[in-house]
């Protein structure tokens, strides 16, 4: 889609921060205009039109859930909805291993994360935007964090309902909605789904982790004695619970010989 408008695409780095630094460097060297991915008033305003679309399409909403990376989408949508219908609550949703907004809210100032998880690479940002944070503080009702397992379960939900494969970041808002809905009832909730940039190799991992995210499976790491009957005793502990997969690793501890030996 981008190439169809005549743009040149340069792939650089393994995450957003590396790509952003490269883009800033090129813009400075070639004296070009840099359009920030999220931390620009015009970018925020453009993304805010989604808020208008939501209110035009749905009435009597109780809450809207928005995925958070740098905060542009959340700032734009929350600003529009807050001005139109203040009764609608707005929640940002983050992955717990890249929760830059959550940390900023706790500190009441922008915080730069030391490490950022890359599973939901579409929202893998180490610091919330300056402009976006100013808007979010005024217009957003709360921030919800979800685990990777809960995120994978949301990807599965979208596929089962629509037969559309969402990328992890695209299913983030739904994961937050599900977590919120588990504590509420009789509420009309809406989640923004954005993004389908999913590598095929990730599908198997998502399928496995979604079972954990839906509390259908548990992953256990257990040490048992290396002697006959140990596995049978373990199975008896589980009772009627079903073991869907079992990986066994034999660990032999020994002291390596010294040069003198």
Residue ranges and their predicted role:
Residues 254-261:
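Conserved small/polar residues in nucleotide/adenosyl-binding loops
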Residues 211-225:
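Short glycine-/aliphatic-rich beta-strand segments at the starts of folded cytosolic domains
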Residues 1, 68-77, 100-101, 169-176, ...:
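Short glycine/serine/threonine-rich phosphate/pyrophosphate-binding segments
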Residues 227-246:
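Short amphipathic alpha-helix segments
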Residues 129-187:
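Active-site-adjacent helical/loop segments in soluble small-molecule enzymes
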Residues 1-63, 81, 94-145, 150-151:
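Small/polar-residue-rich loop-to-helix segments that shape phosphate-bearing ligand pockets
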Residues 179-208:
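Catalytic phosphate/nucleotide-handling subdomain of diverse soluble enzymes
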């Amino acid at each position: 889609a981008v190439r169809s408008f005549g743009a040149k695409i340069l792939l650089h780095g393994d995450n957003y921060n590396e790509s952003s630094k490269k883009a800033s460097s090129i813009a400075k060297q070639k004296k070009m205009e840099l359009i920030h991915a999220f931390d620009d008033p015009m970018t925020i305003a453009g993304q805010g039109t989604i808020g208008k679309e939501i209110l035009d399409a749905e009435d009597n909403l109780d809450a809207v859930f928005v995925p958070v990376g740098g905060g542009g989408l959340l700032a734009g949508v929350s600003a529009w909805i807050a001005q139109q219908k203040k009764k609608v609550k707005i929640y940002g949703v983050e992955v717990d291993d890249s929760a830059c907004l959550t940390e900023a809210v706790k500190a009441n100032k922008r915080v730069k994360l030391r490490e950022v998880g890359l599973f939901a690479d579409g929202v893998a940002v180490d610091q919330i935007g300056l402009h976006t944070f100013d808007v979010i503080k005024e217009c957003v009702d709360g921030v919800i964090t979800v685990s990777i397992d809960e995120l994978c379960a949301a990807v599965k939900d979208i596929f089962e309902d629509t037969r559309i494969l969402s990328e992890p970041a695209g299913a983030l808002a739904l994961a937050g909605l599900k977590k919120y809905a588990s504590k509420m009832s009789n509420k009309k909730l809406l989640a923004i789904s954005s993004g389908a940039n999913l590598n095929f190799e990730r599908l198997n991992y998502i399928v496995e982790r979604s079972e954990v995210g839906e509390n259908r499976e548990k992953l256990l790491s257990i040490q048992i004695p290396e002697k006959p009957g140990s596995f049978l005793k373990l199975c008896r502990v589980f009772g009627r619970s079903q073991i869907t997969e079992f990986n066994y690793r034999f660990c032999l501890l020994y002291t390596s010989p010294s040069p003198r030996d």
